Amino acid sequence: MLKMLSFKLLLLAVALGFFEGDAKFGERNEGSGARRRRCLNGNPPKRLKRRDRRMMSQLELLSGGEMLCGGFYPRLSCCLRSDSPGLGRLENKIFSVTNNTECGKLLEEIKCALCSPHSQSLFHSPEREVLERDLVLPLLCKDYCKEFFYTCRGHIPGFLQTTADEFCFYYARKDGGLCFPDFPRKQVRGPASNYLDQMEEYDKVEEISRKHKHNCFCIQEVVSGLRQPVGALHSGDGSQRLFILEKEGYVKILTPEGEIFKEPYLDIHKLVQSGIKGGDERGLLSLAFHPNYKKNGKLYVSYTTNQERWAIGPHDHILRVVEYTVSRKNPHQVDLRTARVFLEVAELHRKHLGGQLLFGPDGFLYIILGDGMITLDDMEEMDGLSDFTGSVLRLDVDTDMCNVPYSIPRSNPHFNSTNQPPEVFAHGLHDPGRCAVDRHPTDININLTILCSDSNGKNRSSARILQIIKGKDYESEPSLLEFKPFSNGPLVGGFVYRGCQSERLYGSYVFGDRNGNFLTLQQSPVTKQWQEKPLCLGTSGSCRGYFSGHILGFGEDELGEVYILSSSKSMTQTHNGKLYKIVDPKRPLMPEECRATVQPAQTLTSECSRLCRNGYCTPTGKCCCSPGWEGDFCRTAKCEPACRHGGVCVRPNKCLCKKGYLGPQCEQVDRNIRRVTRAGILDQIIDMTSYLLDLTSYIV
């Protein structure tokens, strides 16, 4: 009896081993793949029996030899017996292409993804945002995705109006994981055309990913519905407001409570000339708040425009830097009447513009300009303005001079030079993406650390990260370190993390590329060398959010936390831009030691802002009078020539004349007035009172 029981147990073990091996038949080197196999409804796939496979073969013969889904998944499948390949689950107008074309054949193949034993992973992935897409497709292998795009773009009008790279950015697997087709195809396969081609390496990568998963950071979606956000920064006034720049010409305020004000902080969309095509850099470029913004309310904006007075001469548009002042009455809005033009540079092309504005710890304004793709022949026709292209300018905006908007710092390398403009601090840049100032540099020998991304635009391998140093020529300067190109997207410069919540990132320079890849650079305190580190962003487990779209820029709030700005489309009119925040899942979203008191935004209270009504205040508080005004705080109007016969100048070149006189300067006698001798002092008092009332009405 005991021997019989042992024999039955042995048979049971052999049977279990057989079924397990049968289940894994056709799934090459998956190791723990059985745990990952799930159908779209969450159930495990079924092992097809012989009669199911026989029925599939008969259906294949009836269809004229066309391969059905049963032929793709002969062992494990989520479609049983005579279930049709589409199963009614992929009802979409793109699948109406049923004629005998190559596109129709690919669509029939894609329908079979629902029968895949990995269908849940193919359709439900944190990389995707299905709700925002017109196409419901599985994650495609890269080569297969491009094959589908080029084959079907002429047969599916309205759905493939984009480039192959952009289409496959959303519908192709980027991390080398599971993708469709996950069965052998009779074709010459490239390195990423078929999931089975990379299965051997995938398990190794996944095992490494599982080991380091606990070190990943998360991304938290903060705001959506933005239009091409290109920057986010704080004003340093203690209000902890985040100012979000939109390429079309708007600046919006995000409150510490996570709300966006309905009225924009700055609206110059009528002045800004923005590009709507991919690669067109025109638009609102940058914003920088004065270090003493809380008292003087000064901010500096760079944007592209095209004014009539520049119509003569070779140019496509103008890059302009303007100073604005916040409204005296509303701290959440800019007074557009306070605009003062600082700088204008004529541009011939719509790329390599730069335009980043920064204030360094030295209090000077830095303007980073690209080379504008200008050639030597172009420079001869640019009337000298091209001397600034490809340079970092350093200006002192804290000047009391009313006739010029800035002065030149005496420490500029070309302060006394006749060969270079004195504004130039460094030169030789090509296409500076984004630059950032480290607010707490660790090197005691360097009091200013500016890190910039730059590229000459010819190929991805030319991308570099530069540390800007006074007087240096960066024409052929190598990058801080040689890093492997992780995609064909251009680099997007970020920020040196000096926040509190993600303390593991402290001191790291966080940046990425347009295609959504992230990296960090860290400087060794001993060797002073920069070291590259990938930035791991988790997409599951302790992380609830995930990143999607193209990286447009990075941002930093008043607490030093770093943000990511993205958009899924390149059109400025679409509201699909998002703002993400990098957070450490190992720590609370707002640790107690990271909290800071929020100070309500206040209106300007300086003496100049209160009393200077007929002019503008410099950043240092001096009241500069507008034409026609003079005196303390510009209260006295000027009339040239001066008013005569006791007239009073009440407005520029406007005299208030005494009774009996008229003309611009009260020089004429009014002969229409009847001259009646007044015999009493009462009549004189009445005349003087009437004159004073008229004068008071003008002054008020």
From Swiss-Prot:
Keywords: Cell membrane, Cytoplasm, Disulfide bond, EGF-like domain, Glycoprotein, Membrane, Metal-binding, Repeat, Secreted, Signal, Zinc. A flexible loop interacts with the SHH zinc binding site and contributes to zinc binding. One of its GO terms (biological process) is regulation of fibroblast growth factor receptor signaling pathway. GO terms for cellular component: cell surface; ciliary membrane; cytoplasm; extracellular region; plasma membrane. Its main location: membrane. This is Hedgehog-interacting protein. The keyword Metal-binding applies.
